[in-house]
Amino acid sequence: MRTIAILAAILLFALLAQAKSLQETADEAATQEQPGEDDQDLAVSFEENGLSTLRASGSQARRTCRCRFGRCFRRESYSGSCNINGRISSLCCR
């Protein structure tokens, strides 16, 4: 009887720990999916040769990339990773 109580306590503790980690993951995913204050719109423009540009708009075709937490938006494609304030983020380009 004592063994069953100990096993039940261990099982309950394991389930509680797993539920806690699932809740943290869900909270983290919810904050990543919401565009807004975490969205640090770090824009970088690229010409077709891949070099960063500072020219006036309309000079050549450009790619605009932003460093985002979470996933890229619909029209953007994942182009690597970037770092904002020590957090690894997605580099999303159009």
Curated annotation (Swiss-Prot):
It comes from the Eukaryota. Keywords: Antibiotic, Antimicrobial, Defensin, Disulfide bond, Fungicide, Secreted, Signal. It is found in: Secreted. Disulfide bonds join C65-C93, C67-C82, C72-C92. InterPro entries: Alpha-defensin, Alpha-defensin_C, Alpha-defensin_N. It holds the Pfam family Defensin_propep. Belongs to the alpha-defensin family. Defensins 6 and 7 have bacteriostatic activity against Gram-positive bacteria S.aureus and L.monocytogenes and Gram-negative bacterium E.coli and antifungal activity against C.neoformans. Defensin 7 has microbicidial activity against Gram-positive bacteria S.aureus and L.monocytogenes. This is Neutrophil defensin 6. It comes from Macaca mulatta.
